Design a protein with these regions (language model features):
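Acidic, mature catalytic/reactive cores of soluble proteins
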Residues: 1-599
């Protein structure tokens, strides 16, 4: 049966986008989330976090609906939703945001295209377009023309251009669909051609673009469809204009019910962006690295003494003051709805390693249009200086504790990685003095971390210098080349983390109390880190089983949020989460059969 408009929302959502804007579509074909005019803009569609109010959505409701089916067109982010009624009528909604080459540049307008196709019978449908602005506080006016409707907000005007009757849309009247309908929502610009022809042309061009992009990927033999979907999702999480990468498309989806752990993730965390760039690089999608490199260079050039914040706005904004949107009711009524993220004020030393690690490939990859050179290396060296100075100083850590600071082992290792990679880059550039200097620093840091970050009592590396708590981020020590996979210390650390942080087939990031109490849900990226660590220490069969379980835990469309209830499997946290999609890609690459061995 159809899910009613007043049903509780969930994260069974399809993502569409074009690296300028994005939208989330529920299983009934209703757009319930979408920010304009860019990924971190105000939500024009906010129903996902305001389900107590019948606004902020773009619905195409089939009368007497009995079932729905949703899927992506192969190797694209073009989403199809089929709705069937009890009279034998059916319609298909095809949703996408245009993206393709035009006039020598990438065309990615602030635009959504919805095509409604009659599949069978004489379906009766009602179109409800109820955009919002001002995070639920703003009012707007509506004007109309013969083939369009304008929504006039304080800071932007949106125009719906359509070949459907405008009156029926404005009055939300049910209408018999006797022919296909095209709805184009975008800027307040006249459409000077047939709406249907424009929709078809944009559809064909967009589908071709994504087919060509996917064709360029170096995917593993196993789990190709899942990896391709994850890669497309990561691509949609990048902002072409600057090269920034958002952590997720949403704000304030709670990490766990009624927890207050509601955060705005529509910004660029340097840490998350490194993982995204690294995963796409491994698939051969180097264009993301080149654009992100431009973003990073601009951040470093604009900072004071190359000091880094942990996150920035996708336009490079440095101030992301956190506030609450009181006019929005929250996901399932769970407030607060937060705008901005005060973590930008925090000290997180791993950021220096994240930037250097993200950029390192530029010095070794001959495919790049502009490979790294001495000038870029000199821009990175001040980051290494900070890393060497700060590696043994307290910070908020990668989990962004708001109530305390420690010398976090993961942060220290990432600072070491910054200096280690600078030594490797200097060697590549044939700069012997710089190589020797950075190698000495990295060696000294490694010795300190190996001593201070290790607990003899726990027989494992621990969360912080001199501490006893365990932290799932330490599962990355092998991935970062800090220790070898067969190093007894790493094996012991994996086993200790397994014994303390594993819940069923899922992994917590930590289990001790934090600023909001005791964590209750597993953190999806940590489960993937655990899978990768198991594969590295020779427990491949178990790793493969856990990976298959994670694939079965995705949404029907193959997406993941940040968190998961380890008992029920329900997804929580902002969506879709780049961290989680990165984990899927990396684990697939680690566990797949090689192409040459597969057949």
């Amino acid at each position: 049966m159809t899910r009613g408009a007043d049903a509780m929302p969930d994260l069974e959502l399809g993502l569409i986008g074009n690296c300028q804007i994005s939208a989330l579509v529920d299983t009934q074909g209703t757009i319930v989330w979408g920010c304009f005019p860019r990924l971190d803009g105000e939500p024009v569609f906010s129903h996902l976090i305001d389900d107590g109010n019948d606004r902020g959505r773009f619905a195409i409701e089939l009368q007497d609906q009995t079932s729905s089916r949703q899927y992506y067109l192969r190797n694209t982010p073009i989403l199809c939703t089929e709705l069937h009624d009890r009279h034998g009528g059916a319609l298909r909604i095809t949703d996408f945001a245009p993206r393709f080459a035009q006039y020598g540049r990438r065309f990615r307008p602030v635009m959504l295209v919805r095509h409604v196709e009659v599949m069978s019978g004489t379906p009766v449908a009602r179109i409800r377009l109820r955009p919002t602005a001002g995070y639920g506080a703003d009012t707007h006016t509506v004007t109309q023309g013969s083939n369009h409707v304008r929504f006039v907000f304080d800071d932007q005007v949106l125009r719906l251009t359509t070949d459907a009757p405008v009156t029926s849309i404005l009055q939300e009247q049910a209408q018999v669909l006797e022919r296909d309908v095209t709805l184009i929502l975008g800027p307040d610009e006249s459409v000077t051609e047939s709406v249907a022809e424009m929709g078809r042309r944009f559809f064909d061009e967009t589908r071709t673009y994504w087919h060509e992009w996917v064709r360029s990927l170096a995917v593993p033999f196993d789990w190709q469809s899942a990896v391709i979907r994850a890669a497309i999702t990561l691509k949609l999480s990048t902002f072409d204009d600057t090269g920034a990468v958002v952590a997720a498309m949403t704000t304030s989806i709670p990490e766990v019910a009624d927890s207050g752990r509601n955060w705005d993730y529509r910004y660029c965390w340097l840490r998350d962006a490194y993982f995204v760039v690294h995963a796409l690089n491994r698939l051969g999608a180097t264009g993301t690295l080149e654009r992100y490199l431009r973003y990073i260079i601009n951040l470093v050039a604009g900072s004071d003494d190359a000091l880094l914040q942990p996150l920035y706005g996708i336009g490079g904004e440095t101030t992301l003051t956190e506030s609450e949107a009181d006019h929005l009711g929250g996901y399932r009524g769970m407030k607060p709805v937060r705008i901005g993220n005060d973590a930008y004020r925090q000290i997180q030393h791993d950021s220096y390693g994240a930037v250097v690690l993200a950029v390192t490939q530029a010095f070794f990859d001959e495919r790049l249009t502009r490979p790294g050179d001495v000038a870029l290396f000199r821009r990175l060296e001040p980051l290494g200086e900070h890393a060497a100075r700060l590696f043994d100083q307290p910070d908020a850590g990668l989990w962004e504790y708001r109530g305390h600071e420690k010398v976090h082992t993961y942060s220290a290792v990432m600072c070491w990685a910054a200096c280690d990679r600078l030594a490797r880059i200097a060697d590549r550039l044939e700069l012997p003095d710089a190589h020797d200097a950075w190698r000495r620093r990295a060696g000294d840091m490694h010795a300190v971390i190996s001593e201070q970050g290790w607990s003899e009592r726990r027989g494992a590396f621990v969360e912080s210098f001199g501490g006893e708590r365990l932290d799932a981020s330490l599962l990355l020590l092998h991935e970062l080349d800090f220790v070898a996979a067969d190093d007894p210390r790493f094996v012991a650390t994996v086993e200790a983390i397994e014994g303390e942080l594993r819940r069923g087939d899922h992994m917590f990031r930590y289990i001790g109390d934090d600023d909001f109490g005791t964590p209750e849900n597993a953190f999806n990226i940590c489960t993937f880190w655990y899978i990768d660590a198991l594969a590295a220490i020779g427990r491949g069969a178990e790793a493969r089983r856990l990976f298959e379980n994670m694939l079965a835990s995705t949404t029907r469309l193959g997406l993941l949020s940040e968190d998961m209830d380890p008992t029920t499997g329900e997804l929580w946290g902002n969506f879709p989460q780049t961290y989680s999609m990165v984990g899927l890609i990396n684990s697939a690459l680690a566990l797949s059969r090689r192409w040459e061995d597969a057949f």
